[in-house]
Amino acid sequence: MVKRNVHLTKLQSGYLFPEINRRKNEFLKKHPSAQLINLGIGDTTQPIPLYISEAMQNFAKQLASEKTYRGYGTEQGSILLREAIAEQYYQGKIDPQEVFVSDGSKCDVGRLQILFGSDATIAVQNPTYPAYVDTGVINGQASFFQTSTKQYQRITYMSCLPENNFFPDLANLPKTDLIYFCSPNNPTGSAATNEQLRELVQFAKKRQSIIIFDAAYASFVRSSHIPRSIYEIEGAKEVAIEVGSFSKMIGFTGVRLGWSVVPKQLRFEDGHSVQQDWERIVCTFFNGASNIAQAGGLAALQKEGLQAIDELSSYYMKNSNILKKAFEECGYKVYGGENVPYLWVHFPQLTSWEAFEILLKQSQLVSVPGSGFGSAGEGFLRFSAFGKQSDITVALPRIKHALLKIKPTVY
């Protein structure tokens, strides 16, 4: 028989969200009439704006005609969409040839691991989006999991806590080849300032590292001092790859469309172009994003589409403001929720799973345990504001009922 991939054996038994679903379904079996409200997984709930969905519909209709049918597109993506991303999203700071359209930023995160190989060392924020770690493990960039620390050997974990404003102490970090950094951040809801990102870019230059910058939630940024892209920082093109996503921006979580930016200036240790190798990987592993999805993405970056993006972002951020106020009124410390619709709530007397179970059983609310994002997430829950406002309104009295019962001690 064929031996199992040894790297897959290193993965922990349950990915975070399947475990949440298991506990949720177990609760529903015991309480079939319960009306659960999901404030956990960050899936969108508002429909794709009509202007954008009509663009996809019109493209799909063209596929039914011999005159207008189109098959394979280019692996790198439609040049019209690449130009629109470069112009509208990056204000011309990025060359369209540096943009690679994909089926989502999560897929790009996995393929980027292949670009750098199993010998590459990686650093991740702690807490962090699980895909950065798990794709690294699968690709052989980690050793075995240590139960005592709840961390993988060979991976550097950058502690991001309220005490350091969710920005790591870079001076005390060892050199790694890759630095994964997400801002605005999932799960903590924090967003790095211009000053912090300048420090990160300078650190990467000094250590000769490459930053993988996840900007999936950039469309929600409201503060003028918060960059939407790493390329707003001088010198970032020399040390950073950025991934972006249409998923939360226009409700494309089920459509699947994203992009990566690999600047021409980015080089390997031997001077070879990173972009050239990335293009080879894209062309080898990927046949290009759906033409229909790309038609929607192109529409989203026109005047009417950009207005729809702003309206959608405002809708979810209003939810975030409502939820944040409710938690704070009950005496809880709440982080995030200002530049991304995620709230990071501290439960100082409980473990993350204990807090999860209390809210599930007492208030029929589903959240995400912070410990699932890393050891630094213990004692926190992540709440998503991507729900419907009607559900948020119904959830408020339930939240207050449960929280007041477990009201925290003075911080």
UniProtKB/Swiss-Prot annotation:
GO aspect biological process, one term: lysine biosynthetic process via diaminopimelate, diaminopimelate-aminotransferase pathway
GO molecular function: L,L-diaminopimelate aminotransferase activity; pyridoxal phosphate binding
Coiled-coil spans in chain: none
Cofactor(s) needed for function: pyridoxal 5'-phosphate
Pfam families, per database record: Aminotran_1_2 (PF00155)
EC number: 2.6.1.83
Family that this chain belongs to: Belongs to the class-I pyridoxal-phosphate-dependent aminotransferase family. LL-diaminopimelate aminotransferase subfamily.
Known partners and oligomeric status: Homodimer.
Task performed by this protein: Involved in the synthesis of meso-diaminopimelate (m-DAP or DL-DAP), required for both lysine and peptidoglycan biosynthesis. Catalyzes the direct conversion of tetrahydrodipicolinate to LL-diaminopimelate. Is also able to use meso-diaminopimelate, lysine or ornithine as substrates.
Family matches, as HAMAP family: DapL_aminotrans_1
This protein's name: LL-diaminopimelate aminotransferase
Source organism of the structure: Protochlamydia amoebophila (strain UWE25)
